[in-house]
Amino acid sequence: MVAKELPADDEVAAYIGNLLIDFVHVDNLYRIRNYRGKRLEEVGEMLVESNPVLEASSFEREREVRKHIDDYTLFLTGMFPEYVATLPSRGLRLDSLIDYVKAGKESYRIVGAFDQFEYRHVAPLFRRLAEQFEYCVHGLNRVKSDLEALREEQYQLWKKNLFDV
C-alpha cells in the first residue's frame, strides 16, 4: 500500500512502511522518556529532551530523540492531520505552538547530518526524508484513505488511542 502511494523512492517507501509497522504498537508512539522515566507525549517535550545543551546527555541521545520526532511528526501529519489541526486549540500545551511539518523536516535534517561511522550509510535516506517530507505526508494521507476505505482495524485503534490521550 505504501509503495503504491510513494512510488518515486523505494528506500523512502520501505522506511515509511516499516514506520507504520513499528507504530502498530501504540506504545511505540511514546517510547521516548526523559531522564526521570516520564513518557514524553508532546513534540515540544521531545525537542527539549533532544537538545544537547539542555537535556540530551550525548549526541547519540540527540540523534535517537530527533529520529523519533521525525517519525512521530510524519506519522501524525500523514495519518491523522485532523488531530494535528486540533493542537493549537488544546490550551496551554507546548505542541499548540509547534509546526509539526517544520519540526519533522528539521529533525530529519539533523539526523541526516549524523553521517559518520555507523550512520554513514543511512544519513542520505534521512536527508531525502527531510527534503521530501511534504510528499511523504501526502503519501501517508493517501495510505490513510486506503485504510479507511478498507475499515482497517489497526487504523481505527490508532485513531481511538490518539483522541483518548
Please annotate each region the language model reported.
Residues 138-141, 149-156:
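Intrinsic, low-complexity terminal and presequence regions
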Residues 156, 160, 164-165:
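Helix-rich, well-folded core regions that mediate interactions or catalysis
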Residues 1-137, 142-144:
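Long, non-catalytic protein-protein interaction scaffolds
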